[in-house]
């Protein structure tokens, strides 16, 4: 709480990551950012290399076992290479056997997280 969320996902869960960003904006009234792997590794990665861990961000990785193995590996390698340069990510493993199940699960969790965040910081999530 009190930190801006930065949400990352692979191509399969990126629609949900973008929805989390919008929900943080609308429900919790917080600025939030999102990006997707592998694009993150081409440009945005470098932005974290000169940052300090104590920055006011919370990194959230939305992960799916259905992502291509190379995308899954990028999450792991990125976490190792950026250790100490960015906040340790909060890893959310999508539940469900199919992509549709996983997307619906992650959408619902994101709405719950952002509504609960608003309530914890004393905000009314209803006005948009």
PLM ranges: what are they?
Residues 1-128:
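A SIS-like phosphosugar-recognition module
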């Amino acid at each position: 709480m009190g930190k801006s969320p930065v949400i990352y996902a692979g191509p399969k869960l990126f629609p949900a990551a973008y929805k989390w960003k919008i929900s943080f904006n609308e429900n919790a009234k917080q600025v939030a950012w999102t990006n997707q792997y592998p694009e993150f590794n081409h440009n945005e990665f470098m932005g974290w290399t000169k940052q300090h861990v104590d920055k006011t961000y919370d990194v959230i990785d939305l992960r799916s076992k259905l992502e291509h193995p190379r995308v899954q590996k990028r999450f792991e390698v990125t976490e190792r290479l950026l250790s100490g340069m960015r906040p340790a990510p909060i890893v959310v493993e999508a539940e469900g056997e199919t992509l549709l199940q996983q997307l619906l699960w992650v959408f619902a969790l994101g709405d719950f997280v952002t509504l609960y965040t608003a309530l914890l910081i004393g905000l009314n999530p209803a006005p948009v």
